[in-house]
């Protein structure tokens, strides 16, 4: 029996809803997307604060449990940029990658990490828990691979000897920042229902 009969995911992305639902069964009976008419601006200054803002707002507006995530790429040589602005670093994935590679053209330190924070909010908007996942890697000088999205073609994962874009969705999920954060949320639900 699910711990939560239904919860809302603070996203309009049906693919993300399906991914989260797959990770969170059997603890959440049904996970639904935020209605298209509801937009939540990411106005906070950190991944944690943005995830909490989105989860709390969705919970209060919908009157039910809500889950939200915020994630992005933090490049060491760029002092953590693009960070919380990862999705707004350009108009398209190609433009974001082009800008990143241009800014790193003469940079030898290519270390970077993807960060994901997930927040679970009660129907009154209070935060029940946040979880975090990180995946360390390096920024390549040119894209590799056809899969994934965003910065995946230039994000090299040394432990896998491939970019995210060269991994299958299942392989990526096993090592990614979002996969780690979702696994920690699963562990939280397991403590509620031993």
UniProtKB/Swiss-Prot annotation:
Highest taxon listed in the record's lineage: Bacteria
Cofactor note: Binds 1 Mg(2+) ion per subunit.
Active site feature: 70
List of residues binding substrate: 11-16, 71, 149-152, 172, 177-178
UniProtKB keywords: Hydrolase, Magnesium, Metal-binding, Nucleotide metabolism, Nucleotide-binding
Cofactor dependence: Mg(2+)
Positions with a binding annotation for Mg(2+): 70
Record-level GO cellular component terms: cytosol
UniProt GO BP: nucleotide metabolic process; purine nucleoside triphosphate catabolic process
Pfam family, one: Ham1p_like
InterPro entries according to UniProt: dITP/XTP_pyrophosphatase, ITPase-like_fam, RdgB/HAM1
Molecular functions (GO terms): dITP diphosphatase activity; ITP diphosphatase activity; metal ion binding; nucleotide binding; ribonucleoside triphosphate phosphatase activity; XTP diphosphatase activity
EC number: 3.6.1.66
Family assignment from sequence similarity: Belongs to the HAM1 NTPase family.
Function: Pyrophosphatase that catalyzes the hydrolysis of nucleoside triphosphates to their monophosphate derivatives, with a high preference for the non-canonical purine nucleotides XTP (xanthosine triphosphate), dITP (deoxyinosine triphosphate) and ITP. Seems to function as a house-cleaning enzyme that removes non-canonical purine nucleotides from the nucleotide pool, thus preventing their incorporation into DNA/RNA and avoiding chromosomal lesions.
Assembly, per entry: Homodimer.
Protein name: dITP/XTP pyrophosphatase
Species for this entry: Thermosynechococcus vestitus (strain NIES-2133 / IAM M-273 / BP-1)
